[in-house]
A protein has these predicted regions:
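Core subunits and conserved enzymes of cellular information-processing
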Residues: 2-214
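Positively charged, small/polar-rich N-terminal and surface patches that mediate targeting and assembly
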Residues: 4, 54, 125-127, 151-155, ...
Length: 289
């Protein structure tokens, strides 16, 4: 089940399309909802909000310099592929922030409802971060520190690592902005960490599938040739009938599981199917320990 050069190219293109779209979603949330309200949930963009408030330096200029330094750390500790994809994300975000500052300047918040702005300032970057983490990239900045922390410590959750690395930035907001903004920022940081973990869990969700059938060949062929996944089978017997059957075990993504279910139904195969949701799958085609 070797992957062809064309398929590898499509995977790379697809990955960078996802990275670009994710960064665009994040930039919209940061520029239109986070910066105008001085929300500081941590990260380089949070630091940029502090710097823009205290100095003449623009948010995009500070983001560029800080991201370059942290990108070097990512290359050293997280690898070349991570650094290249995160570098692309950093370039896209910096360019988009600069374009927004030039062509869509903001003098204040978009609405007079801070809670509404907080929802968008939280949801858009958090969802974008989860999408980036899922394809092995990040938006740069303190996300890099969080991933290094997770890799070299016993932390299991990305959200927990993000919370720890960004907490200092939120505490700084208490001294730079008013207490009202600082409290919003602390709530925002907590919710952001929870949202990132929740979205990542849903995106990593797979189906561990157990199939009892009379004919293993069509099902195994479909899994291996159409879905390009592995499967394991063993002979078994029904307890009530004492008739011989085959038991097939495979692990698929949610979309692939639906395809397999539709195939079995379409071919009218005599099969009993049990699906169990799982988020931790290690091995070829999935995560690597």
């Amino acid at each position: 089940m070797e992957i062809s050069t064309r398929e590898k190219t499509l995977q790379i293109v697809s990955r960078y399309v996802i990275i670009t779209l994710s960064i665009s979603i994040m930039t919209i949330g940061v520029y239109f909802f986070k910066f105008p309200n001085n929300f500081v949930f941590g990260g380089v963009t949070g630091g940029a909000a502090l710097v823009a408030k205290l100095t003449p330096l623009s948010a995009s200029a500070f983001s560029s310099g800080a991201n370059i330094l942290l990108l070097i750390l990512g290359w050293i500790f997280l690898g070349r592929d991570f650094a290249i994809s995160t570098g692309w994300a950093t370039v896209v975000m910096t360019a988009e922030l600069a374009l927004f500052e030039k062509y869509v300047p903001l003098s204040g918040p978009l609405s007079d409802q801070p809670m509404l702005d907080l929802v968008f300032a939280l949801a858009l970057p958090a969802i974008a971060s989860a999408l980036l983490f899922n394809v092995g990239a990040s938006s740069g900045g303190t996300d890099v520190i969080a991933l290094i922390l997770k890799k070299y410590t016993h932390m299991q959750n990305t959200g927990e690592a993000l919370f720890i690395t960004d907490l200092a930035m939120v505490l700084a907001a208490c001294f730079v902005f008013d207490l009202y903004t600082a409290l919003y920022s602390f709530v925002g940081l907590t919710v952001k960490s929870l949202v990132v973990d929740a979205v990542l869990e849903q995106m990593k969700m797979c189906k561990a599938i157990l199939i009892i059938c009379d004919d293993k060949d069509p099902i195994c062929d479909f899994v291996m040739r159409k879905l390009v996944r592995g499967a394991t089978y063993t002979p078994c017997y029904g307890a009530y009938t004492d008739r011989p059957h085959y038991m097939i075990y495979t692990t698929l993504t949610h979309r692939e599981a639906l395809q397999l279910q539709a195939f079995i139904h379409k071919e009218n195969l005599n099969a009993f199917i049990s699906m169990l949701s799982t988020t931790e799958v290690f091995g070829k085609g999935f995560n690597h320990a």
